[in-house]
């Protein structure tokens, strides 16, 4: 099941504060990942276009995130649960009734209703078997002689270093 919560409509104070902390680049981190104090003198003071782009991507991502674990779960009452169960079962019944023709088909195609007569009949003449073998050999030969000639390169380089 999915979540129908939209962050654009309702924001709690805690959500706004979390977003503000995520989006506020002026608050420096307290510690580096390795536990050492960060060196602020080595950071460049001017933001580049790339950093501005990354910040805007981060802002868009943070505004579009839906925290499913923080969303209040809407519990269903017993009658709502039973109504949904009935609704789903009627939908399944409608869908399964349209697929009943698949259940009626035999697992293997039936060429005859009396296979014992086919098995007891005369075998296929040897000349017919030879003719089918020759036709299959000609078809195999024709297929094996199919060639694709390259007229131009498949991959073209665009002079990118």
Swiss-Prot record:
List the GO terms this entry assigns under cellular component, sorted alphabetically.
late endosome membrane; lysosomal membrane; lysosome; membrane raft; Ragulator complex
State the UniProt keywords alphabetically. Answer: Endosome, Isopeptide bond, Lipoprotein, Lysosome, Membrane, Myristate, Palmitate, Phosphoprotein, Ubl conjugation
Protein role: Key component of the Ragulator complex, a multiprotein complex involved in amino acid sensing and activation of mTORC1, a signaling complex promoting cell growth in response to growth factors, energy levels, and amino acids. Activated by amino acids through a mechanism involving the lysosomal V-ATPase, the Ragulator plays a dual role for the small GTPases Rag (RagA/RRAGA, RagB/RRAGB, RagC/RRAGC and/or RagD/RRAGD): it (1) acts as a guanine nucleotide exchange factor (GEF), activating the small GTPases Rag and (2) mediates recruitment of Rag GTPases to the lysosome membrane.
Q: Where in the cell is it found?
A: Lysosome membrane; Late endosome membrane
A Pfam family the protein falls into = LAMTOR
Q: Which GO terms describe its molecular function?
A: protein-membrane adaptor activity
Entry protein name = Ragulator complex protein LAMTOR1
Cross-linked residues, Glycyl lysine isopeptide (Lys-Gly) (interchain with G-Cter in ubiquitin):
20, 31, 60, 103-104
So what family is this one in?
Belongs to the LAMTOR1 family.
Where a lipid (S-palmitoyl cysteine) is covalently attached, the residues are 3-4
> Which sequence positions carry the modification called Phosphoserine?
27, 42, 56, 98, 141
The UniProt gene name for this protein comes to LAMTOR1
Q: Name one GO biological process term.
A: regulation of receptor recycling
Report residue spans for region: Disordered: 1-43
Q: Where is the lipid attached (N-myristoyl glycine)?
A: 2
The keyword Transcription is assigned to this record: no
Q: How does it sit in the membrane?
A: Lipid-anchor
Upper taxonomic classification of the species? Eukaryota, Metazoa, Chordata, Craniata, Vertebrata
| Subunit-level organization | Part of the Ragulator complex composed of LAMTOR1, LAMTOR2, LAMTOR3, LAMTOR4 and LAMTOR5. LAMTOR4 and LAMTOR5 form a heterodimer that interacts, through LAMTOR1, with a LAMTOR2, LAMTOR3 heterodimer. Interacts with LAMTOR2 and LAMTOR3; the interaction is direct. The Ragulator complex interacts with both the mTORC1 complex and heterodimers constituted of the Rag GTPases RagA/RRAGA, RagB/RRAGB, RagC/RRAGC and RagD/RRAGD; regulated by amino acid availability. The Ragulator complex interacts with SLC38A9; the probable amino acid sensor.
């Amino acid at each position: 099941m999915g979540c129908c919560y939209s962050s654009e409509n309702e924001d709690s104070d805690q959500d706004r504060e979390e977003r503000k902390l995520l989006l506020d680049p002026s608050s420096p981190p307290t510690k580096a990942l390795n536990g050492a104090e960060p060196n602020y003198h080595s950071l460049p003071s001017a933001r580049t276009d790339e950093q501005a782009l990354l910040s805007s991507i981060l802002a868009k991502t943070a505004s579009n995130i839906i925290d499913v674990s923080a969303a209040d779960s809407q519990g269903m009452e017993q009658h709502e649960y039973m109504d949904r169960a009935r609704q789903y079962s009627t939908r399944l019944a409608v869908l399964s009734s349209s697929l009943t023709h698949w259940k009626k088909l035999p697992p293997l195609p039936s060429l005859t209703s009396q296979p014992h007569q086919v098995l007891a009949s005369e075998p296929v003449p040897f000349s017919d078997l030879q003719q089918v073998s020759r036709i299959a050999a000609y078809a195999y030969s024709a297929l094996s002689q199919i060639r694709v000639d390259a007229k131009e390169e498949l991959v073209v380089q665009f002079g990118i270093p």
